[in-house]
Amino acid sequence: LKDLKRLWLISLFVKLILAALIPLSADEAYYWVWSHRLQLSYFDHPPMVAWLFSLGHFLEPFMNAVRWPAVFLGHAAIWVGIKLLQKHLDIEKIRTWIYLVLFSPLLGFGSLIVTPDLPVIFFWLLSLYCLDQVLEKKDLNSYAAFGAALGLGFCAKYHIVLFVPCLLLYLFLEKKWNTVNWKWVPATLITGLLFCLPVILWNYQNDFASFKFQLEHGLERPHYDPEWTISYVLAQILIIFPVVLWAALKVKPANPVRFMIYFAWLPLLFFLGTSFKALVEANWPIIAYPAVFMLAAMHPRMAQWKKYYIGFFGAITAAALVILLVPQFRTLNPKISEPFDFQNLAQETAKYQPLYGDSYQMSSSLWYFSKTPVFKLKDISRFDFFDTLPEAKPAGNKFYLVKHEGNGLPQWLSEQQWTYQEIKKIAPDFVVLEFTRP
């Protein structure tokens, strides 16, 4: 295990350095804003990502090191995976699994970006580890820890609920019901409920708004577009990588680790099914990847095949870092240049107070880079966390709005007799408006 520990520590060090160098994306800045308004949960997502950012507040003087607590937790998931696999696989296969994770575009480079995916991957793997303990030890502590891991996973991202059908399908199809110590199952249910209570309470207090939003966001569209399914399938083949996918499909795991089959393929099949109802974002099945990579690592040829995987995604990762860190390349894509545009915008608009933005992305980024509160103007874009804040409507008789040219204004401004004048244009397509009222 010493070699694996060294690999884990070196890769952690590299991640922490890169995480500090790369500026926060707009979504990350949004979660960072949440961390300055801590709640039991939030409209868009459960609260874990905000809690992790709050732990990093003291690191903000060190570039973008506010990410470090979340990045560390995401990397700790690899160590949990090592502890799970060391009972079942030899060192070489575990090393192969680590490399598959480290060079994965979402589990590797993607783990530098703080989203709800980081904590949910940790608690998904921790739940797998606890399940392995439950099946082996069958004691109260194991069952209680299993429930706690699932409950905390629910505080990270709602996708953790897919763990339950994966487990039930495994117990049913593999005829493993007799391995369950039923007298301790209530301990799992109780600790699971206790540790996900913040999310349950918040939704109860807010008419289950977050649950409704996620269901509508992921499952409801009026008409089917075949491109949803095609893009989902192609994206997953590319992200997992054809050779890795082939190895995972062909391997026949030994009985003690057959549960990996269900935790690998059921989430992928679930989101394949939802692709017939709505567009599926490429990262949604991320919970399946650790088990897919575990299956692939068991294939006798994967130790040799992994060089193609590492070469392909290693080159892409290197190119992404060059594009992010070398200013001349940032203009290749608007999403790449966005954090840098917002960083410049924060400097250009610093003298305009109170300042509002026209989207949660803009407002959050300006707030993060300026360290001065910048709220999104209420109802100027789709409903989000900012619309729940009293500051979303200006209290005085004067304020400033920075927005993208061409974006509209909310109706209530004219109803409240606000008038405005354009006072500044800022590249690439921003405009600052001054609003006043009698």
Question: Where are the predicted features?
Answer:
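Short helix- or helix-capping micro-motifs
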Residues: 8, 94-105, 150, 154
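Membrane-interface alpha helices of multi-pass inner-membrane proteins
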Residues: 37, 109, 142-158, 192-194, ...
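Transmembrane-helix motifs of polytopic, lipid-linked glycan transferases
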Residues: 68-89, 126, 130
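Specific aromatic-rich, kink-prone transmembrane helix
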Residues: 78-80, 119-136, 142-150, 292-295
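Membrane-interface transmembrane helices that cradle and orient dolichyl/undecaprenyl
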Residues: 86-91, 127-142, 250-254, 300
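Short acidic/glycine- and proline-prone juxtamembrane loop motifs at membrane-interface regions
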Residues: 106-120
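Transmembrane-lumen/periplasm boundary regions of multi-pass, lipid-linked membrane glycan transferases
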Residues: 152, 163-254, 272
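Membrane-proximal, lumen/periplasm-facing interface regions of secretory-pathway glyco-
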Residues: 278, 305-351, 360-375, 379-391, ...
